[in-house]
């Protein structure tokens, strides 16, 4: 079901969407991260898939810019309510392009 939020996995799309989750507890996780990165990038190229913000997120701010049509509005809202970036961290700055 589509929603009208700015950066959710379903925002701005009218098609059905599906979630596929992978998890491992095996250490080290290098091979898992390699597979997850391959899948994330392949799904992006093939289907414009959006990765869950709280999972392994290998995509770049360039991917985010292409996937989320309201990302500029989201950045504007963040800058207006958090002008000093107090609630940002390196993930947010890197992935959202602050």
Language-model features: locations:
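Short amphipathic alpha-helical patches
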Residues: 63-70, 98
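Intrinsic disorder at enzyme termini
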Residues: 74-98
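Substrate-recognition/cap regions that form aromatic- and gly/pro-loop-enriched pockets
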Residues: 1-59, 63-66
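C-terminal, helix-dominated tail/subdomain
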Residues: 18-22, 70, 74, 80
């Amino acid at each position: 079901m589509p929603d009208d939020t700015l950066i959710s996995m379903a925002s701005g799309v009218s098609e059905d969407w599906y979630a596929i989750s992978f998890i491992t507890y095996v250490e080290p996780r290098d091979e898992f991260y390699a597979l997850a990165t391959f899948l994330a990038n392949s799904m992006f190229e093939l289907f414009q898939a959006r990765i869950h913000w709280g999972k392994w997120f290998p995509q770049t701010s360039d991917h985010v810019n292409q996937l989320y049509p309201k990302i500029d509005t989201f950045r504007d809202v963040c800058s207006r309510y958090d002008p000093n970036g107090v609630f940002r961290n390196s993930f947010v700055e890197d992935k959202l392009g602050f």
